Regions:
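Hydrophobic core segments of alpha-helical transmembrane domains in multi-pass membrane proteins
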Residues: 80-89
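Membrane-cytosol interface motif
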Residues: 110-119
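Cytosol/matrix-facing amphipathic helices and coiled-coil assembly/linker segments
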Residues: 9-51
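Transmembrane alpha-helical segments and their cytosolic interface motifs
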Residues: 49-77
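Organelle targeting or membrane-anchoring low-complexity regions in eukaryotic organelle proteins
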Residues: 124-148
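Juxtamembrane membrane-interface segments at transmembrane alpha-helix termini
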Residues: 92-103
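Cytosol-facing regions at membranes
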Residues: 1-16, 131
């Protein structure tokens, strides 16, 4: 079964972990909203630097693959099984949204790009970035606001 890109990680994450991530996001929004426009701008800069779970999984997989290949070349050909297993896990994650490191990374608080964007756009709305969109109602204004 192939799940949607947006939902595949949350669907394969324990409900209490999803709820914890959602609470943290909502608390962040409330905290930075009370700090005003400058606090929101600083938080948006932080969000631009936040690694989503996909990036973390890709980095871990690439690192483990390189280690497995290096050990396969220098120590024993048996180590070549490591990159093969990792490739299988990456394929499983791409199709189903689950792989062995996923629960660990989610417990550590890694969010999906959609979850990060939820916070980003809530903060932008609070800062007033989308004010002109509803007033003008044109595609040009909507695109300009989306680029903020």
């Amino acid at each position: 079964m192939v799940t949607s890109t947006r939902d595949r990680v949350p669907l394969n994450t324990d409900a209490c972990i999803n709820a914890s991530i959602r609470r943290k996001t909502e608390n962040n929004i409330a905290y930075y909203a009370s700090g005003g426009s400058d606090a929101i701008t600083r938080r948006l800069a932080e969000l631009d630097q936040e690694w989503d779970i996909e990036r973390m999984l890709e980095t871990n997989a690439a690192t483990a693959t390189l280690i497995g290949m290096t050990l396969g070349i220098t120590v024993s050909k048996k180590w070549f099984v490591v990159p093969a297993v990792i490739a299988g896990f990456l394929l499983q994650h791409a199709v189903q949204g689950w792989c062995p490191p996923l629960p660990i990374l989610r417990r550590m608080g890694f969010r999906t790009a959609s979850e990060i964007d939820y916070e980003r756009y809530a903060l932008k709305a609070l800062r007033g970035d989308f004010r002109n969109v509803s007033e003008a109602g044109t595609a040009g204004h909507a695109l300009a606001a989306a680029e903020c």
